[in-house]
């Protein structure tokens, strides 16, 4: 894996965006608001369960997975939302996976991609996403705010991903309601769960917070549970022998 992981991804995204056309807006898929759900269900650490066939750091993870069956298992075992990788080149995802899953589940769905343009946002919404991902490290603050406001104007919720204190401060400044702390450094691709613990001391009351990456066991989940509303988990679920059991293991009771 290149040390310049994020710039490599963004260069590819620029090429993809140049080929996209702005789609006509389709009706927004109806489900509950993730923010409201996380605010009103704080007795448990909520799980955002990811459908991910591969990644740059892990290579192929589970290429033969039945994506709809996997998503339904997540939903049946209490996942708060399903994250669907739509990046083709680096994660072997596809926008069609989001479309398929969104028609088969009732809970919110996250379009997991490196979004840099309004055309990607509309495409994700039309494919069934109710939440999109915006990564602070991928965008200048003014552009991040533009895309955030555009997405919310279309009825979408936005997971704003951060990795360090300056990025967390940006997320707070733009008024993000759902903030992710990625324990993976998108430049070196190394993970450290302490990233979540350190940044949690700077949290505010209004947003909800999601810890992302480097969470594989109930013990990992328990470390962040006192400070976070939820966790985003992909690899641990995609490689689990018993997916239902793994989801339950990660749902830490917060009392």
Swiss-Prot record:
PROSITE patterns in alphabetical order: IGPS
Reactions catalysed: 1-(2-carboxyphenylamino)-1-deoxy-D-ribulose 5-phosphate + H(+) = (1S,2R)-1-C-(indol-3-yl)glycerol 3-phosphate + CO2 + H2O
This protein's pathway: Amino-acid biosynthesis; L-tryptophan biosynthesis; L-tryptophan from chorismate: step 4/5
Gene Ontology MF, one: phosphoribosylanthranilate isomerase activity
Pfam families, alphabetized: IGPS
The entry's keywords: Amino-acid biosynthesis, Aromatic amino acid biosynthesis, Decarboxylase, Lyase, Tryptophan biosynthesis
Key word Cytoplasm present: no
Enzyme Commission number(s) of this protein: 4.1.1.48
Keyword Repeat annotated: no
A biological-process GO annotation: L-tryptophan biosynthetic process
Similarity comment: family membership: Belongs to the TrpC family.
Record protein name field: Indole-3-glycerol phosphate synthase
Higher taxonomy: Bacteria, Bacillati, Bacillota, Bacilli, Lactobacillales
Gene: trpC
């Amino acid at each position: 894996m290149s040390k310049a992981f994020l710039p490599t991804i963004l260069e590819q995204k620029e090429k993809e965006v140049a080929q996209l056309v702005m789609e006509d807006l389709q009706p927004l898929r109806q489900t509950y608001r993730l923010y409201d759900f996380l605010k009103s269900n704080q007795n448990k650490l909520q799980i955002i369960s990811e459908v991910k066939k591969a990644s740059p750091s892990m290579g192929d993870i589970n290429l033969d997975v039945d994506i709809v069956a996997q998503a339904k298992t997540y939903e049946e075992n209490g996942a708060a939302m399903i994250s669907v990788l739509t990046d083709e080149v680096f994660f072997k995802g596809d926008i069609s996976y989001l479309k398929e899953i969104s028609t088969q589940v009732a809970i919110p769905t996250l379009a997991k991609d490196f979004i840099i343009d309004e055309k990607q946002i509309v495409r994700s919404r039309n494919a069934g996403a109710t939440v999109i991902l915006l990564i602070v490290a991928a965008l200048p603050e003014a552009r991040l705010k533009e895309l955030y406001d555009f997405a919310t104007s279309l009825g979408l919720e936005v997971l704003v991903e951060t990795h360090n204190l300056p990025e967390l401060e940006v997320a707070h400044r733009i008024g993000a309601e759902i903030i992710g702390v990625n324990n993976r450094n998108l430049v070196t691709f190394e993970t450290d769960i302490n990233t979540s613990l350190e940044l949690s001391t700077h949290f505010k009351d209004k947003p909800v917070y999601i810890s992302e990456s480097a969470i594989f066991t109930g013990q990992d989940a328990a470390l962040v549970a006192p400070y976070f509303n939820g966790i985003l988990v992909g690899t641990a679920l995609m490689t689990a022998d018993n997916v239902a059991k793994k989801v339950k293991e990660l749902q830490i009771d917060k009392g």
